[in-house]
């Protein structure tokens, strides 16, 4: 059976260049980067090189890069380690569970946590954000750069201008979950005025189990994982060097190829949406309009009235089409999307949405097969 993977926002296959680098590093490197002997020094040199290459791709400095086990740990490190003691935390209403649950944990511990509203397409209300921050004690602001389910891109430039208009006493540290943004739209975290940003290698063709937290030198961060003092004391534990080396290759290529990726996936996504509209009566696109610059080019969140993701996703899988009914970070469960519930959709509609996310190598032939399967299963 020919299978079609349209769940690239969950993970995208390891690209050949990253795989080659992973295997090279596994064979070539036998030392611990923290050891002082020759093998350790060679490993340290490779680690430093990967750090500098990722930093250059992101437009930041190598000493500001902290390696983690993935995007979830990077987000947790920013939320728990970047929120000053006794200071408030402000989060977007549609955050990934790794931010949402971290915020809930702080709230249970007595911290003031504020949810910032969004419009019906998932765009952050910057006027409400500024009103919530003005006159308050400076804390931490965490808003995802791009939503993993809707594909909505946050108004980062508007947010920057709002924050610049605040007094120093009220201006928070600013963290963004950039896991879905990397390689899909051009952005530079430092130019935007961010203080911290989280990334995940496997979303851009790198290996699983590697994340990056960029933390500007000016931002105070407390470590959450302590022990041997690796990563300049910010994240203890021996680094997964072969995977980090492969991640550097994948991130470099994702940034270098971003313009081509954006153009190609936007064109294919628009074509896919037109076919869905004509094939499935009542199908509705959630999030920004298909041509909007506020939408990730590869992501469609489609509401299919009367559908139930608990039944539909496995049925589509049996036919060879791999999609999701929301975020992949739910232990394999198919629950009503918290994102859609937060937007005011009822539980039935929140179960009736499919996320289709294209990748770098998605072909027109695969999309034709996907439409055939959708038409047969849902039409």
Enumerate the predicted regions with their spans.
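Pyridoxal 5′-phosphate
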Residues: 1-379
């Amino acid at each position: 059976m020919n299978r079609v993977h349209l769940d690239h926002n969950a993970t995208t296959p390891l690209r050949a260049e990253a795989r080659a680098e992973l295997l090279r590093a596994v064979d070539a490197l036998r030392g611990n980067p923290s050891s002082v002997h020759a093998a350790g020094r060679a490993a340290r040199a490779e680690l430093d090189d990967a750090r500098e290459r990722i930093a250059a791709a992101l437009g930041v400095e190598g000493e500001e890069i902290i390696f983690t086990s993935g995007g979830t740990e990077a987000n947790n490190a920013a939320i728990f380690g970047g929120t000053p003691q006794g200071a408030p935390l402000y989060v977007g209403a549609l955050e990934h569970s790794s931010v949402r649950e971290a915020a809930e944990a702080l709230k249970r511990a007595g911290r003031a946590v504020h949810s910032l509203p969004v419009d019906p397409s998932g765009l952050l209300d910057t006027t409400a954000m500024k009103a919530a921050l003005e006159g308050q004690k400076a804390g931490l602001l965490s808003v995802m750069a791009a939503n993993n389910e809707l594909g909505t891109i946050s108004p980062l430039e508007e947010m920057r201008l709002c924050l610049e208009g605040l007094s120093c006493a009220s201006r928070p540290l600013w963290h963004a979950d950039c896991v879905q943004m990397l390689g899909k739209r051009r952005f530079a975290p430092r130019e935007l005025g961010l203080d911290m940003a989280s990334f995940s290698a496997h979303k851009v063709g790198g290996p699983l189990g590697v994340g990056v937290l960029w933390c500007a030198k000016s931002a105070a961060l407390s470590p959450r994982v302590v022990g041997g003092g690796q990563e300049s004391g910010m994240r203890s534990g021996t680094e997964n060097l072969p995977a980090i080396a492969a991640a550097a290759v994948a991130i470099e290529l994702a940034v270098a190829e971003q313009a081509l990726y954006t153009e190609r996936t936007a064109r294919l996504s628009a074509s896919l949406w037109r076919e869905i509209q004509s094939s499935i009566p009542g199908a509705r696109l959630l999030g920004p309009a298909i041509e909007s610059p506020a939408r990730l080019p590869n992501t469609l969140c489609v509401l299919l009235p009367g559908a139930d993701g608990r039944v539909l996703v496995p049925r589509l899988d049996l036919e060879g089409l791999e999609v999701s009914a929301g975020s992949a970070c739910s232990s394999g469960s198919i629950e009503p999307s918290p994102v859609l519930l937060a937007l005011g959709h009822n539980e039935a509609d929140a179960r009736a949405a499919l996320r289709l996310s294209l990748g770098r190598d998605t072909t027109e032939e695969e999309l034709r097969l996907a439409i055939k399967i959708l038409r047969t299963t849902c039409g």
